[in-house]
């Protein structure tokens, strides 16, 4: 039903991550070191919040709070409101709140058609926007190539690459400036390593998409590593959540991925079906 781009690949990715975690644990090494990478902290941006609210005061307050969480140097802004003016007003509210030195990528979550994406992208070109992410449907490579050719702001795609070949095809089509694969969809650690080689050959900066607890390890060994997307979704059920210091993710010096569940929290949040 889902084909090779659906549930089967998600399952393979999960098993692959577990496999690499087990190997690193057996070796007594953090996964990053087991993969041959350094343990240096990874530049991270805060991807919690900054959604499509029309309350610009609340949006500004949230932006200041997100930057202060870990002295972040970047935070993602969600756009895709009913009008261009509303999106620009929201972006400016965040920019005014955090100042000129904080990088502000934006994500449209595939919410626009190509004509509107070009229109809003042109407006964002004048707003010191760090990147434009997934403005149109994820597999419209012709459209993304047109955006990259006509806009000044870097074009970021990749969370919907299903396997490393998708990344190769996107880069061959000149459909993006930067790439950001998702561990669940790219093929786990093995798929990530393949994608990292492709990105290196293309000279394409490569960021991660969510799963920061594992992504930090694979980013450490990525030659063109760019930004780790940080979200704290799993923190409430983790014994030791991923640490952020001075805007960087600190790779845990524990065997494997270092992920350990807070069993009491897991039971507290569990749903009985």
For each feature predicted by the language model, list its residue ranges.
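N-terminal capping/lid subdomain adjacent to the active-site entrance of alpha/beta enzymes
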Residues: 1-104, 109-111, 115-118, 122-126, ...
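Buried hydrophobic packing segments
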Residues: 15, 19-23, 195, 215-219
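Structural signal for conserved beta-strand scaffold positions within catalytic alpha/beta enzyme cores
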Residues: 46, 180, 229-230
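Residues at the C-termini of beta-strands that transition into short coil/loop
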Residues: 48, 159, 210, 231, ...
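Surface-exposed, flexible loop/turn segments at secondary-structure boundaries
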Residues: 52, 163, 214
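Catalytic core of soluble alpha/beta enzymes
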Residues: 77-209, 217
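Active-site pocket-lining/capping segments in soluble small-molecule metabolic enzymes
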Residues: 212-241, 246
